[in-house]
Amino acid sequence: MKWKTSRRSFVQSAAASVVPAVLMQMRPGVAKALGSLGADTPEAAGDAAWKNAGVVDTARSPFAKLRPVPVRAVEIQEGFWSKRRTTNVDSSIPSMHDELIDHGRMDNFLRLEGKSTQPQKGPVFSDSDIYKWMEAVGFVLQSGDRPSLRATTESMIRDVVAIQEPSGYLNTYYQDDRKALRMQYDVQTTGHELYCLGHMLQGAIAIYRANGDRTLLDAGIRFVDGYLLPNFGPRANQKGIVSGHPEIEMALMELYRTTGERKYVDLAGYILHGDSRIPLRQQQVVYMYCGIPFPQRTRLEGHAVRAMYACCGATDYYLETGDPAYWKTLNTLWEDLNQHQLYVTGGVGARETGEAFGDAYELPNARAYGESCAAIGMMMWNWRMLAASGEARFTDVIERALYNGINSGMSLDGRTYCYRNPLAFDPKGDSSDRHAPEGKIRNPWYDTTCCPPNLERTFASLPGYFYSTSDDGVYVHLYDNSAMSWRLKDGSAVRIQQTTKYPWEGTVKITVSPAEAREFVLHVRIPGWSAKNTVKVNGAVVSDVRAGAYLPIKRRWTAGDTVELSFDMTTRLLKANPAVNEDRGRVAFQRGPVVFCMEGLDQANKAGNLVGYTAKLDGESSVRYEADLLGGVVVLEHPGAVAQSAADTGLYYSANASEKVTENAATLRLIPYYAWSNRAPSTMQVWVPYRYS
């Protein structure tokens, strides 16, 4: 039976509750999967089950090939990511707390509690800033207790739940004369009520999984059970739901995984399917990326963050139901992402107007939007696709975004942030750029401050992305000095230790130490960017190593067995598809997973701009690690030239008038893209014009 149900017939066929309304529309296999949900719930696994949950807890998801390893089971040791994570905990999260307080985000709650006389401040989604910050703290606490941070968060949670209404409703914006607007159809499209609830649930779950504290979680459940489920859904006596800004879908799915309550899967499925009773214009359906059955989507369009979050929720739904229509659509959208919409830095979203995806191959550089939240959403989506498939193509995309378009979003000192992440920039350029006031692309605060706490929760949760387990063994996804202490499917303990200088060097030593000798498969990822690879097990070379895939190493492992990986760290000069107009005649530099860029202040002429520089396409880059530069980075130097025009050169001149322009040899100096704009203001570009010798 093919999925051809319209939104109207879906709603008309709704029965006495959300559950049968959804089940009636599904293939027998999907309905059976839904009917069995909750049979092996977290509650049934013991009182301490919250300790064992991953970032996305697919441990019991019937259509997941991989199971997560909890944040607490992985230690990121001294190396590349440890510096970022230390800065995140010691600088970013505390300073963002102060920004949230200074800009009235907590006063919005305190006002309703009678503890503040300040008026409501901030946009409609202000509550979500608090919840994302709390989620970041939850992941920090999963790596180890921080008493002061925990106490601060517990105090904030008490103030949040104190204003919850008897119905379960909890939102600081729709109060006083705005109460009548709650969940009205025209408000649902842009009002962010369910978006805020989604972040409340995600923050609550992260905190619950850190220390078992259910205070915020129970408040979130009361909101869903007491306010949403009785009043909103497909029944004739209920109002319809459109999420407006997808987020609630994946939050409900994670709430199911936390509680075992099937009704949350069904509610998420109803929202993903859309409700024809809500009148939507086509432009709204495109921009919001919701409101019609998700399987009807054929391309990525509209608001980039909304689209990525919708894909996260849809993948979560597939992981629990196995609906093939969802999986087919998700793969179609993923191909669109990788063939037409993905920046070389892992950023997504080309247009400032609507913070949106553009047309196929529309990937401008200076005008690139590349919102930090969109890159994070894209990583979150690919993590779920990886869980469903076990395929390295998704991990390659995660790595590209993580090292480049996400890592660029936070300054090296952790106190300023990029809302957008362009691939070319001039601080003296467009004065109308609202995200770069006075030419500053990094700022400590934005009134739409979704990106800073989103970056903070991502870096706090990073240990949970390094490893997974499967029916046959362990998967190693990301590389850095780290140690996983967890267990195989049969419950036996195993420790995986990585020793490496990745991403600056391409060698990784993995030491495998099961508590007792065990036969299982160690799946190690061979990055798609690495052309030549060597793998050794206890010194013996392994054959059939393929780039862009997981290498399965099956053996009886004993404590101290080693796997040595050697990746190709040759600097690669990348060309874009000719259909990408702005990149035609240009190259981008990538070494390992790291994309590089030029900053004007690094070039020999110190001119402050990058006009006229070209790279020799057949030149060879030299590589040098500079420990005292930008926290310690690899620097590339590449032969090229810089052109200078004669004083009388007009706007246009004859192609034969060679005397108008002179070229002098120059050495181009490039730094990692993630580290740009951490010194004095400077021009920057990723895509460099090239020439042949």
Per-range role (PLM):
Residues 42-147, 151, 181-210, 246-263, ...:
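Aromatic (Trp/Tyr) and acidic
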Residues 176, 180, 184, 188-191, ...:
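Asp-box/WD-like beta-propeller blade repeats and closely related beta-sheet repeat scaffolds
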Residues 536-540, 592:
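Short strand-turn-strand beta-turns centered on an Asx-Gly dipeptide
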